[in-house]
């Protein structure tokens, strides 16, 4: 009786749940925002990204969006980033809100991700001044 229960317990504790893995996507992006690493963030971009930074809004290619994000980090060097809110209940959609502290101000970063094939890609990235 103990062996089957032990097997079931080990089976569920040894394999991370998809819920845990989903949270890591936004956590990893938060770490990249803290480091100001536009290249690593852009690696998660879809082929086209709706990018809203402060008052500029448009749809850009992956390469263009990376350059715009790099320019943002040059103008606003990051100091700290933390996850404020995370929605990961839909298996094909992720949404996270980060608080980004920079040397020149505090921003609210909203990240919308959609699943394509077996990976999540950023389809919308919004960086707005935190009020």
Task: Cite the ranges covered by each PLM segment.
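Short beta-strand edge/turn micro-motifs at domain boundaries
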Residues: 106-131
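Short, aromatic-enriched amphipathic alpha-helices that serve as compact interaction elements
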Residues: 21-37
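A short gly/proline-enriched turn/hairpin at secondary-structure junctions
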Residues: 51-58
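Short, well-ordered alpha-helical segments enriched in acidic and aromatic residues
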Residues: 37-48
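Sec-dependent N-terminal signal peptides
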Residues: 4-14
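Extracytoplasmic
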Residues: 44-46, 91-95, 106-108, 120
């Amino acid at each position: 009786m103990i062996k089957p229960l032990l097997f079931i317990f080990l089976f569920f504790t040894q394999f991370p749940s998809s819920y845990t893995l989903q949270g890591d996507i936004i956590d990893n992006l938060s770490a990249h925002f803290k480091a100001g690493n536009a290249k690593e963030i852009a690696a998660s971009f879809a082929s086209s990204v709706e990018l809203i930074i402060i008052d500029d809004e448009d749809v850009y290619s992956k390469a263009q969006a990376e350059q715009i994000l790099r320019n943002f980090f040059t103008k606003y060097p990051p100091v700290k980033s933390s996850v404020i809110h995370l929605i990961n209940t839909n298996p094909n959609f992720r949404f996270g809100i980060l608080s980004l502290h920079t040397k020149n101000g505090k921003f609210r970063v909203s990240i919308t991700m959609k699943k394509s094939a077996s990976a999540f890609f950023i389809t919308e990235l919004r960086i707005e001044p935190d009020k």
